[in-house]
Amino acid sequence: MAQSVLVPPGPDSFRFFTRESLAAIEQRIAEEKAKRPKQERKDEDDENGPKPNSDLEAGKSLPFIYGDIPPEMVSEPLEDLDPYYINKKTFIVLNKGKAISRFSATSALYILTPFNPIRKLAIKILVHSLFNVLIMCTILTNCVFMTMSNPPDWTKNVEYTFTGIYTFESLIKILARGFCLEDFTFLRDPWNWLDFTVITFAYVTEFVNLGNVSALRTFRVLRALKTISVIPGLKTIVGALIQSVKKLSDVMILTVFCLSVFALIGLQLFMGNLRNKCLQWPPDNSTFEINITSFFNNSLDWNGTAFNRTMNMFNWDEYIEDKSHFYFLEGQNDALLCGNSSDAGQCPEGYICVKAGRNPNYGYTSFDTFSWAFLSLFRLMTQDFWENLYQLTLRAAGKTYMIFFVLVIFLGSFYLINLILAVVAMAYEEQNQATLEEAEQKEAEFQQMLEQLKKQQEEAQAAAAAASAESRDFSGAGGIGVFSESSSVASKLSSKSEKELKNRRKKKKQKEQAGEEEKEDAVRKSASEDSIRKKGFRFSLEGSRLTYEKRFSSPHQSLLSIRGSLFSPRRNSRASLFSFKGRVKDIGSENDFADDEHSTFEDNDSRRDSLFVPHRHGERRPSNVSQASRASRGIPTLPMNGKMHSAVDCNGVVSLVGGPSALTSPVGQLLPEGTTTETEIRKRRSSSYHVSMDLLEDPTSRQRAMSMASILTNTMEELEESRQKCPPCWYKFANMCLIWDCCKPWLKVKHVVNLVVMDPFVDLAITICIVLNTLFMAMEHYPMTEQFSSVLSVGNLVFTGIFTAEMFLKIIAMDPYYYFQEGWNIFDGFIVSLSLMELGLANVEGLSVLRSFRLLRVFKLAKSWPTLNMLIKIIGNSVGALGNLTLVLAIIVFIFAVVGMQLFGKSYKECVCKISNDCELPRWHMHDFFHSFLIVFRVLCGEWIETMWDCMEVAGQTMCLTVFMMVMVIGNLVVLNLFLALLLSSFSSDNLAATDDDNEMNNLQIAVGRMQKGIDFVKRKIREFIQKAFVRKQKALDEIKPLEDLNNKKDSCISNHTTIEIGKDLNYLKDGNGTTSGIGSSVEKYVVDESDYMSFINNPSLTVTVPIAVGESDFENLNTEEFSSESDMEESKEKLNATSSSEGSTVDIGAPAEGEQPEAEPEESLEPEACFTEDCVRKFKCCQISIEEGKGKLWWNLRKTCYKIVEHNWFETFIVFMILLSSGALAFEDIYIEQRKTIKTMLEYADKVFTYIFILEMLLKWVAYGFQMYFTNAWCWLDFLIVDVSLVSLTANALGYSELGAIKSLRTLRALRPLRALSRFEGMRVVVNALLGAIPSIMNVLLVCLIFWLIFSIMGVNLFAGKFYHCINYTTGEMFDVSVVNNYSECQALIESNQTARWKNVKVNFDNVGLGYLSLLQVATFKGWMDIMYAAVDSRNVELQPKYEDNLYMYLYFVIFIIFGSFFTLNLFIGVIIDNFNQQKKKFGGQDIFMTEEQKKYYNAMKKLGSKKPQKPIPRPANKFQGMVFDFVTKQVFDISIMILICLNMVTMMVETDDQSQEMTNILYWINLVFIVLFTGECVLKLISLRHYYFTIGWNIFDFVVVILSIVGMFLAELIEKYFVSPTLFRVIRLARIGRILRLIKGAKGIRTLLFALMMSLPALFNIGLLLFLVMFIYAIFGMSNFAYVKREVGIDDMFNFETFGNSMICLFQITTSAGWDGLLAPILNSGPPDCDPEKDHPGSSVKGDCGNPSVGIFFFVSYIIISFLVVVNMYIAVILENFSVATEESAEPLSEDDFEMFYEVWEKFDPDATQFIEFCKLSDFAAALDPPLLIAKPNKVQLIAMDLPMVSGDRIHCLDILFAFTKRVLGESGEMDALRIQMEERFMASNPSKVSYEPITTTLKRKQEEVSAIVIQRAYRRYLLKQKVKKVSSIYKKDKGKEDEGTPIKEDIITDKLNENSTPEKTDVTPSTTSPPSYDSVTKPEKEKFEKDKSEKEDKGKDIRESKK
């Protein structure tokens, strides 16, 4: 294969596929077969054998390098180009678009050979591009027909047409390809299976009557899937999807398992509870007296049978089944639930709690059987409407059961759902890695082609070198003259050279003469290019994969289809000049998954076209680009006049030939086609001079640089000819009409305008205008006064005017031609023209939406706001990459929508009365396509359960469950998680860090910088003036001045982010001698343009502000992309004098800056610090006290004492205790506090005590630490403020102001007290610090989201303001129909005529931007969004009564918002947090960064090793019977059978249901009894055999307890059920034992990885949980003090409210997942009558009224949701993702924990006394008893000896030595291991003090050598004896039989010895046994070679070992 690649292919590589070609292939196959037997073994092992070339796969486009296809060869069979198929019967066909199709060369259907005209015709049709288009159109039309809900009759015929076309397509394919026998035939492509099934079904349903046809007809929907097979990019995405589904199998198993366990627990706990209802009692119509109590008791026990005998007239069953007797809350379909425990829901007066009727929600929500319980838990896990289930269950069972939900939500929901995300994300990552690796591989092939070219041109090079001295000079200087293939490729572009190339190939003999001229040219070019590469640019540093040639050679195949390949992987970034951190992010990211050659380049021309594309200004260029462009811009030979030699093509791309941007893009062909304006080039050029100044100091480099420019010009011109797409007249037109420079005066005007418009201040002004304009738009609200709206409209006109003026002035200044070359300008122009159009159409009805286009102006901010820019880019990138995914998602949604409509549409119509009271279709139904689509979309948003209940009620359970589950799993869990994974991948810290336009300051920063400078200047002048006034301070002035100047210069030298700011201020830069090091000296070097001033504040990409000493700067860790690249510029700058701080380097300063050393090692000093800061002391002399004598000394001693007290850990413990107590006290202040007088008084006193204690603590700390230290610590500030709050409220109480509103609100701030606990708990502090670290970026994203949402909010205000008002009847709460009340005035009329009507608004609406935000938050969290959506869909106009679904397509506003506002922005939060998490880990996690992969593996193995030690096994009992039992019990089989029993026990528990018959109950009782007996038996057996050792094992104690409980439970079941949890629960706990068995099952590795990840994340999750609890605690107390008395409605009722601490916690836990927060917020939004009564009295309390405080309520809930839902929960996700990836790495490592455990388990058997030694003779058995990978199978003597294990006296070997040797064998040798090994031994010694200190006296190797020497001597002696014997015996040999018998063994001995010669230690290697992976060379080389090699190696190794031992 390799050879065939080497020939650079060209247009002459195409040959027709003829009969001869076929014969040749057949002959090759025959030869192969003949060769085969000999090489059989080799072939099998050769996994690195030839593989098909990925660029020539079927379906791809022909690589560019092959040139154009000769027209006569299009659509004709050609010989296969891919060398892999050289001996396979295939041929290819290329169509006009150069797409490759591969066919089998065997006969199709046994009849049609490849040369048959019918087949040829079929092939021609098949490959024709129109054929695909036809099929595509057919499918789309078919899809349109499928969306019809009641299709008319004529569609039947259309169906036949479709079927006909599909049949025709399949026939063509079958004729062209063959049916199914060979490769590349019809059925070999899985996509064709789909076609085949679809067609078969079409015919089957047509001719065979199969009953339920509609179900079968739904199969037609699968046709939509065919689009996937037709659009190429989609196949890959689907591939990725299928991959991730495969990967999900483990997670799915785990999920199902966990859910089953939880469902079992739920079944046991809540079985039948949800049927408890409030029954009216006594019955109102009762005419007789009944002793209620006795009756009631009977009824419960015998379900009413008891008294039916006594009273015939009253039928209990009927009574309780009658719905009307239950208690219903208004507007509810289900009766109110209740429970009989004290903390469950109580019934109102006159009702009792009875189990009756069906379960809630049509009976589908229950725990009555295992399957319903499972469904309920699945719903809990996906968190859909779970607050409903939560409330129902707590109401029926009691509030204590909240614990169950906490567990399920945290372990089940968060963990499992995020595992799914983690797995999908990892599958995606791997897919990405694969594409990158493929690209690397291509690059390697590419290098081979280069080599080939180099060889071809070598002779020519000599000639060329002689001819041109210049070129020789260059190649000499340039080092190795590597020829860039661009010489041949670039020239291949022009047709002239193409012919020459052909000639060259055909006439290889006359190679030299034919191409002489051209080659010389090429040589000159490549040689000089070489010099560029070496000196000017140094692109090809060693190790960099980005060699410069590749830029020019973009025409080559691999670069075309590579997408991201140019991006060097991270690990090379140190060596490569360009660090591509964001490698797939900036460029071509749409190709992350796709094979879209099409998307990258349409065809030949456009490829050529975009080879060198100048940059669009506004885009942030990847740093690599800017590097090159800087360097190239610095070249002096570039033309400086305003006019550049430029050429334009139709796309408006200007390429400035010879101009600076000729090289701007090293990644030319992959960049967005954009442009650069002249002014900008000028600006950039001046600003970037200094970059190449150093380069140009060197005369040779200067000369080279000059020649470089000319070369570029040549190459470019040659390219130019080949790439002008448009006819020349276009260019003339562009130059004439679009570039205006006609006359002098005009140019002057233009110049002036340019100066003004391009000034940074103008930019600043425009930005301010944009902000103001946005404000103006956001000020719209309802109702508005006339004046206000007129002000707004005038403002709008003004702003439109300003923006229009800006646009026209810019056009004048820049010429339209250049103006529209820049993205931002096009955007501006678009918006301005829209605004003007909108002004014209202002009065046209229905076009008001145009106003919302003004909102796009907000995006202009992105120009100067990096984060917004980044967000838009991320969304852009993702949308690119998501393009295909979105299509797939759309197809899935479409398919399910159609399936739903076809399957359930009719049932919705027929059974509508089941689900709707008025027999009208509800809003969510599947009767037509649009509504069906909405339901599917809603399921994708995660809301499936409610729509599914409706569906199950009308259309039957099984079908609905199946369809909804499929949508849920496929759509939501897989596709949406893939979405998220894509987002996370296009999101990375690099994008965050270096968002700024790479090295251009943006204009705003320049403007702000100028202002800053002005202010500084004024300040300095004033200061100087003051100082001059006081001459005595002259000296000070002299000191200050140079520093000031230095400071100003600092600004300038930091242009272009290159130099890092040093220190906080230059005053610190003293080197060791205390003199300030002269940065000035290096400053002069830079020629600085004024546009380069930089303010650090505005420049987010400079994150480093700490001085870094040279040694410690680690480029990997800096965030700015620049650094890693510029560090390499160092190499070339060694000539520069050392003082200069060359760019990118951290400035070389001798000693680290002051104040740095103490920071590194904070030593615990035992002395207090100074009280005040130095400045204070300087200003107020009185603060200086001598501590040597007098008062000062006393003071100092006092401080020391205080310091000791404060530092004492008892003090800390005491304070923590106090904090906890005071926090706890807050929890008592609920609404009942007034009734509990004693508690109230106690709390008041306690409060005072706490306050005094905290004040004392504060004073002590002040004295001990001093103000300076106390007030520089953030935690102390927190304490200080909280103490202040208590102090103020205390004082107020004392003065009698306690009833003041302000003081009351201050008291609520006491809720912050628990925050003080934060600094005291290590775990929480870690989490908080991590969070605080993330806050800046979270805030950034939050701001950006707000801007993003602002647009939707303003749009919502435009669409819906004031339209949500409606007229209702407030007694029933029903809305009047439009026929009754049509508008506001009619409603008013009703009100005046004393009707119970009211004109009312929806609480959450779009009347202003603030409320708009609230509504959008509800929509984005999918809570309460329904009401908003219904209101929007029903709205008509302001002051009109809404009408049902009048405005149906308003749904789309919400759909769009959910996609962009919710999916994107909320997931960005996850992105930011995960990202920050990783960055912080990098900051703190020191050791990993400095370890190689190998070391890491070894280190991890060792870490695990260290924690283990051999244990004494339980001795086998001496008693014979006990011994037998012992053997039986310790066998693995026993364990497994117990496991099986446990599982069976579970199954029997699953069978249990709530309404099972008596018989069933009895059966289950007996089965359970059997199990109890069996488990008791196990327990007894183990007790007998293990004796007292039984209790040393945790699991056994666990079993024992469970068994005891089961037995007790059997006898006392009734009693226990009454008071405790049902005993059956303990059986569930047994399931935990399954965890043990997982170790024994090989296949469960994946599941164990997942559990391992969970175990690893537990500590972190515990910390986050603690933090979350703290937040909940504080909010609960706030809630109690603010919302305790609000009206009970919507989500607030008798159980869920803020009245007591417990209730508040229950509510807040529910909102943690954002569930149901809208319901809790609604009552709080009631601000006055008639919604609530501000004067209402509450008995037992002085508070009046039940109104809420809307602003406090909104703040409370929104802040809580942001903190808990977005932050804490996402941290949870981040931890899990992190640990999952770690766990996966762990499981991928060769040695895991279990392997070591297994080692020690086996060890116990061989070393029963735990001596830690084993005898040498046992070693072989021991090694063979292990499991792989440590296993060394027998025969293993040789290998073990070769390991050279140290032995102690008595031939014993220590377990560690064995383990080390075995580990080394698995991991491979490595030098650094010895150090680690020593560490490990020390650690082992520490953990096992018992380890015998042993002196090895010999080693296995030495022992063997001694043995061998003995054997050699023996053998020589024996041989001598033998010879004697043989001589004697030979004469009488035949007679003497006995001797012969003696002789044979000796002979055998000799033979064995001969064999043994090969096994002496010197000669053998530790050849890996078959179990370990074979080393590749050892397999491929013949045996003999291997022995030879091994022999020598081993001898060396032996020597080394011996020497090291000495």
Swiss-Prot record:
Cross-link Glycyl lysine isopeptide (Lys-Gly) (interchain with G-Cter in SUMO1): where in chain: 38
IV repeats: 1514-1812
Site for Binds Mu-conotoxin KIIIA, residues: 330, 362, 917, 921, 946, 950, 1375, 1430, 1444
Residues found modified as Phosphoserine: 4, 468, 471, 484, 526, 528, 531, 553-554, 558, 573, 576, 589, 610, 623, 687-688, 722, 1507, 1931, 1972
I repeats: 111-456
Biological process terms in GO annotation: cellular response to hypoxia; dentate gyrus development; determination of adult lifespan; intrinsic apoptotic signaling pathway in response to osmotic stress; memory; nerve development; nervous system development; neuron apoptotic process
III repeat boundaries on the chain: 1191-1505
Segments dipping into the membrane without crossing: 370-394, 929-949, 1410-1431, 1701-1723
Subcellular location(s) per record: Cell membrane
Tissue expression summary: Expressed in brain (at protein level). Detected in hippocampus, cortex and brain stem.
PROSITE patterns according to UniProt: IQ (PS50096)
Residue stretches spanning the membrane: 130-148, 156-176, 191-208, 215-231, 251-270, 402-422, 761-779, 791-810, 825-844, 847-864, 881-899, 963-983, 1211-1228, 1242-1260, 1275-1293, 1302-1320, 1338-1357, 1449-1470, 1534-1551, 1563-1581, 1594-1611, 1625-1641, 1661-1678, 1754-1776
Catalytic activity: Na(+)(in) = Na(+)(out)
Site (Binds SCN2B): residue numbering on this chain: 910
Bias (Acidic residues): 1156-1167
Swiss-Prot/TrEMBL site (Important for channel closure) positions: 1490
Gene Ontology molecular function, alphabetical: sodium channel activity; voltage-gated sodium channel activity
Ranges for the II repeats: 742-1014
Residues bearing the modification Phosphothreonine: 1944, 1964, 1967
Domain notes: The sequence contains 4 internal repeats, each with 5 hydrophobic segments (S1, S2, S3, S5, S6) and one positively charged segment (S4). Segments S4 are probably the voltage-sensors and are characterized by a series of positively charged amino acids at every third position.
Entry's family note: Belongs to the sodium channel (TC 1.A.1.10) family. Nav1.2/SCN2A subfamily.
Assembly and binders: Heterooligomer of a large alpha subunit and a smaller beta subunit. Heterooligomer with SCN2B or SCN4B; disulfide-linked. Interacts with NEDD4L. Interacts with CALM. Interacts with TMEM233.
Function as written in the Swiss-Prot or TrEMBL entry: Mediates the voltage-dependent sodium ion permeability of excitable membranes. Assuming opened or closed conformations in response to the voltage difference across the membrane, the protein forms a sodium-selective channel through which Na(+) ions may pass in accordance with their electrochemical gradient. Implicated in the regulation of hippocampal replay occurring within sharp wave ripples (SPW-R) important for memory.
Protein name: Sodium channel protein type 2 subunit alpha
Gene: Scn2a
